[in-house]
Swiss-Prot record:
PANTHER family: TRANSCRIPTIONAL ACTIVATOR HAA1-RELATED. One of its GO terms (biological process) is negative regulation of transcription by RNA polymerase II. Residues 63-92 are annotated as: Disordered. This is Metal-binding regulatory protein cuf1. Changing K45A: No nuclear localization. The keyword Transcription applies. It comes from Schizosaccharomyces pombe (strain 972 / ATCC 24843) (Fission yeast). Copper-sensing transcription factor that regulates iron uptake genes. Under copper starvation conditions activates the transcription of the copper transport genes, ctr4, ctr5 and ctr6. Residues 69-92 have a biased composition (Low complexity). Pfam families: Copper-fist. Its main location: cytoplasm.
Length: 411
């Protein structure tokens, strides 16, 4: 096989015997090797229009004759494959030279509106017909001309939120469909402290503002329960009681309640225990404090929640996670006490349950003390002193009252 002016040549016997690639005959007449595939049936102008404008029509340049080229005067530089595929006359011997493409200035005998008009509707472009298409055979985006006749691809259908806001991300239901919910999650959804589903759209928390935030908040809502934004506090929900028990054992946070409580973190960093799921619709929580429920808005006002707990009043918080001006660097498995980024970790909930259990015992002891004192006063009609009350009350033992103040025997 001999290459002359970027055209592969071989003798006729080797071409017919399918040995054109190994042909080394120099004493025979050589002929150009036709490329594989179907022959070109369109002129150069129609081929460019087929690619750039998607005009899949038959070439109407029927005035073209064999051995002539139907093209206008242009300076289009075609590669070797396009030159060999053209229908121009090709020299039949080595002695003849191929004319350069820039000097070809032939015209159709009869001008056609689709081929050889005086004012072509498409300007000549320097396009490589083989390398300027993608893997699907479509022209690349950077090579597509900006014209009104170009057919744009349809945009993908966008999802819309519940209140009509456009969202290009998946709905929140599809993100959390395969996530395991806590065992008492249905009880939480029935509680009067949940976020209403029919409040106005201007206070609807939009999950579609960022794909990263939407996925992260969807996962947190599936594990810890949906956050409450209306009344200024966030529900801290953790269904893993084993992790809370392990954290309590590690840090010796005893006593603990029989069932871990659910807490709400206020905007100022305080924590408030919420009613348990067994007393969801009751007038008071497990501590006996009444909670004001607004029936019109179906949420709890944070000003009526009992005894806000501040962890810094009970524990030393050396971790930077508990500081308001620092971000957590521990990741999703953070177990730092009082972490503001992960307030529902097992260590924080174990400490809150420990403080709540102590306050509950103090409240119950105080109530029993006042009840016992009232009964004694009503029966004896006189007020007992502290020493007499300490000696007669079963709540005060040697660990809580100094031994010198305890009297033995009956009063």
């Amino acid at each position: 096989m001999v290459v002359i002016n970027n055209v592969k040549m071989a003798c006729m016997k080797c071409i017919r015997g399918h040995r054109s690639s190994t042909c080394k005959h120099n004493d025979r007449e050589l002929f150009p090797i036709r490329p594989k595939g179907r022959p070109i049936s369109q002129c150069e102008k129609c081929r460019i229009a087929r690619i750039t404008r998607h005009l899949h029509v038959k070439c109407t340049c029927n005035s073209r004759k064999k051995g002539s080229k139907c093209s206008t005067s242009s300076t289009t530089d075609l590669d070797s494959s396009s030159a060999s595929n053209s229908s121009c006359s090709i020299p039949s011997s080595i002695s003849e030279k191929l004319l350069p493409r820039d000097n070809v200035k032939t015209h159709c005998p009869k001008r056609s509106a689709s081929c050889c008009g005086k004012k072509p509707d498409v300007m000549p472009l320097k396009i490589n017909l083989e390398s300027q298409t993608d893997f699907m055979g479509m022209p690349l985006q950077s090579q597509r001309p900006h014209s009104e006749s170009y057919r744009m691809l349809p945009e993908p259908e966008k999802f819309k939120s519940e209140y009509g806001y456009p969202s290009q991300f998946l709905p929140i239901e599809k993100l959390t469909s395969n996530v395991a919910y806590p065992p008492n999650y249905n009880n939480y959804l029935k509680s009067p402290y949940q976020q209403p589903t029919n409040f106005p759209p201007e206070i609807q928390y939009n999950y579609s503002h960022s794909p990263q935030h939407s996925i992260q908040e969807a996962e947190e809502a599936a594990v810890y329960g949906p956050p409450v934004y209306r009344s200024g506090y966030q529900i801290l929900y953790n269904n893993n009681t084993d992790s809370i028990a392990a954290a309590a054992a590690t840090h010796d946070l005893y006593p603990q309640p029989d069932v871990p409580l659910t807490f709400a973190m206020l905007a100022d960093g305080n924590y408030v225990p919420l009613p348990s799921s067994t007393n969801t619709y009751g007038p008071s929580n497990s501590y006996g404090y009444e909670i004001n429920i607004n029936e019109s808005t179906n949420h709890v006002d944070s000003s009526y929640l009992p005894h806000p707990i501040q962890l810094s009043n009970y524990f030393t918080l050396p971790s930077s996670c508990a500081q308001a001006d620092a971000a957590c660097q521990c990741g999703d498995n953070c177990e730092c006490l009082g972490c503001l980024t992960h307030p529902n970790n097992a260590t924080t909930l174990a400490a809150l349950n420990h403080i709540s259990a102590l306050e509950k015992e103090t409240i119950s002891h105080t109530d029993l003390h006042h009840t016992f004192k009232h009964e004694v006063n009503s029966s004896n009609n006189y007020e007992l002193t502290n020493d007499e009350l300490a000696a007669s009350s079963p709540l005060y033992t040697s660990s809580s009252v100094p031994p010198s103040h305890i009297t033995t025997g009956s009063t």
